[in-house]
Amino acid sequence: MSAGLKITLIKSQIGAPTAQKAVLNGMGLNKLNKTVVLKNTPEIVGMIAKVSHMVKVEE
């Protein structure tokens, strides 16, 4: 469960609730189409679940 996840922001933060913006900023996704690679931990999986409609996840 320690493999990396490739996460890309595909929907703008404009109009999103403050909590969702905070989650995206916590993952380092601050611009549209930005991609980050994060470890597959329960914390990151929970963050992805909060903003699943705004991101694309690849293994």
Curated annotation (Swiss-Prot):
Lineage top rank: taxon: Bacteria
Residue ranges that the Swiss-Prot or TrEMBL entry lists as coiled coil: none
Any one GO molecular function term: structural constituent of ribosome
GO biological process: translation
GO cellular component: cytosolic large ribosomal subunit
Alphabetized InterPro entries for the sequence: Ribo_uL30_ferredoxin-like_sf, Ribosomal_uL30_bac-type, Ribosomal_uL30_ferredoxin-like
Signal sequence, start to end: none
Keywords associated with the record: Ribonucleoprotein, Ribosomal protein
Family classification: Belongs to the universal ribosomal protein uL30 family.
SUBUNIT field: Part of the 50S ribosomal subunit.
The protein's name in its UniProt record: Large ribosomal subunit protein uL30
